[in-house]
């Protein structure tokens, strides 16, 4: 083995904050469906604690063997709206508590899948689940929730968008951390290893291992070596770096799936930042020549980064999936936080950036008195970007505090300045409800 590659890898881990962000085990709960909610909960608990009992131990063993930090071990499950629909329960908080209890028992960091897919309309279980979200998140520590309100094939369910504006407000009122564990999607993917949007799709195998990597610091260090060179060189540098990062992700995923005796799913190519200095996507964009993220040129820089990461990653791994792109969560990226506080990055520019990257308005704090209709309208805008561009977009927004306040979440969730929003009303627009039809270019058959 080339000694240069060995020292490069050591440097990536020790100096540039490279880590495996998550090993996520997807578990199907379709065989746990029961008309009696108590029996369903017993089956759910038994299956998760059986299938995931060794996940944390195996993750720690691989981390120690390879010398690579594996930050989170997580589980995603079949959308609970499907599982709960067979019961006559009026809410699914009991199922959420069961998921939480199972997550604590096996020692994982988060469990995702308290979810509903309502892009074309509500079924019984969907409506019950959505109305259960505020209390489900308030009464659990590790449960994450997501709702898919639109898709390129179906259009946007504006009645669901309206409801989610209300649910986000209710969730914020019920618990300070609840909204950090709630994502509203368009074009949600079935094999996402990242929280809070992970759920195990019904088309997946019974149990699967998916891996998410994190390496903005590694990319930034590589770009420092080509300062002032053309964008051709920048793109090639990012591509080669993404190849190395993804190779390690694939190795970890294969080792984990072999030891756990389950199928290896995908590596998610997303560059996921943390609040630590030196682990920021914003600083990567600034390294390309921007004085501060949010200035003119930011969207173009992000487009180059996103595309080069995908090209490098696809060459390194035979199974790529999830969201796969650059994440731009405000609270989880110290460069984004600095740009918001300096006034160079606002909500409108973030929205433009979401037309490029793999997520939407992520971990953004807005004033607590923001009307539910304005939150719903933000969701509608993001869903429209995703639906028209045939890509995944999302909103994870936290109505808390007053404009200019700094909200502390702690850990990987970081801290977020409360951002200014447009005060003009969207209430009459949101009140219409109904369905925004699928775009003309969605008809492929």
Swiss-Prot record:
Concerning InterPro entries, the annotation shows: UPF0210 (IPR007841)
Question: Sorted alphabetically, which Pfam families does this protein's record hold?
Answer: DUF711 (PF05167)
Indicate the transmembrane segments per the record.
none
Question: Can you state the subunit structure given in the record?
Answer: Homodimer.
The family assignment reads: Belongs to the UPF0210 family.
Q: What protein name applies here? A: UPF0210 protein Ccon26_06850
């Amino acid at each position: 083995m080339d000694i240069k590659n060995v020292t490069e890898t050591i440097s990536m881990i020790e100096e540039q904050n490279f880590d495996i962000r998550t090993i996520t085990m997807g578990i199907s709960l379709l065989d746990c469906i029961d008309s009696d909610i108590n029996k369903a909960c017993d089956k759910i608990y038994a299956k998760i604690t059986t299938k995931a009992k060794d996940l944390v131990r195996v993750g720690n063993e691989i981390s120690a063997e390879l010398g690579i930090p594996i930050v989170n071990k997580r589980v995603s499950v079949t959308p609970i709206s499907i599982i709960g629909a067979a019961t006559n329960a009026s809410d699914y908080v009991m199922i959420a508590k069961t998921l939480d209890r199972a997550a604590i028992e096996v020692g994982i960091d988060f469990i995702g899948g308290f979810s509903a897919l309502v892009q074309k309309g509500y079924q019984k279980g969907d409506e019950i689940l959505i109305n259960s979200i505020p209390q489900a998140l308030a009464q659990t520590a590790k449960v994450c929730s997501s709702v898919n309100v639109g898709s390129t094939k179906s259009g946007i369910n504006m009645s669901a968008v309206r409801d989610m504006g209300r649910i986000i407000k209710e969730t914020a009122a019920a618990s300070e951390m609840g909204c950090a564990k709630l994502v509203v999607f368009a074009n949600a993917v079935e094999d996402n290893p990242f929280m809070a949007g992970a759920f195990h799709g019904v088309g997946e195998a019974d149990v699967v291992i998916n891996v998410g990597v994190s390496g903005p610091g590694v990319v930034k260090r590589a770009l420092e070596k080509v300062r002032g060179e053309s964008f051709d060189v920048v793109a090639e540098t990012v591509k080669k770096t993404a190849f190395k990062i993804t190779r390690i992700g694939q190795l970890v995923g294969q080792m984990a799936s072999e030891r756990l005796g389950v199928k290896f799913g995908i590596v998610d190519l997303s560059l996921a930042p943390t609040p630590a200095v030196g682990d920021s996507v914003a600083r990567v964009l600034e390294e390309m020549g921007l004085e501060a993220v949010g200035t003119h040129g930011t969207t173009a820089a992000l487009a180059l980064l996103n595309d080069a990461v995908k090209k490098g990653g696809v060459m390194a791994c035979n199974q790529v999936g999830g969201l796969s792109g650059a994440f731009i969560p405000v609270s989880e990226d110290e460069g984004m936080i600095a740009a918001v506080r300096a006034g160079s990055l606002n909500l409108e520019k973030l929205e433009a950036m979401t037309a490029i990257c793999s997520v939407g308005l992520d971990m953004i704090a807005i004033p607590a008195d923001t009307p539910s209709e304005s939150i719903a309208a933000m969701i509608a805008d993001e869903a429209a970007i995703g639906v028209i561009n045939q890509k995944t977009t999302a909103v994870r927004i936290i109505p808390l505090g007053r404009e200019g306040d700094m909200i502390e979440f702690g850990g990987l969730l970081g801290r977020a300045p409360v951002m200014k929003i447009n005060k003009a009303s969207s209430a009459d627009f949101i009140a219409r409800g109904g369905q925004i039809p699928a775009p003309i270019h969605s008809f492929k058959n």
